[in-house]
Amino acid sequence: MSGDVLLSIVVVALVFLAAVASGLLAVYSFRRIDHPLSESYGTLIAIVSLWAGGYLLMLVAGGTLLAEIGLFVKAVFSALAAFAWLRFVSEYTGDSEWLPGWLWWLGAAESIVWSVLVVSNPGGLILEGVEIGQFGVVTAAVETPGLGAAVQLLI
């Protein structure tokens, strides 16, 4: 049992560290770096930070309203991360002119629709369930993906 306690503390600490470190890198990129890629890099890292923050809420607030908020935040920013990554890579490789401007709006809309579907979970299509369990000193909420999650991965 003491191994579970230590492991749960390490997991929570590492997720917290990921959220804070990536958030600080995003702020640094936006404020201090004068480079053509700093905006797209900062956006990507800020989204990753918020994604980790949502996951942290799910870890520490299992079974409460905060865990559901964490699930929503994690769903929004995990979907946005793919579009932010595409934007960063296209600018990094110099191929951003091939991507239409409306693609980013489509990505934002898709991310919002996805997160609403995750939280509402119609008929268990998106998530088979959210398990609440004790993990060391943490009561964690962990979702089991459904068929809709597999479709989202293909998108």
Give the residues covered by each predicted segment.
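Individual alpha-helical transmembrane segments in multi-pass integral membrane proteins
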Residues: 5-22, 31-133, 142-155
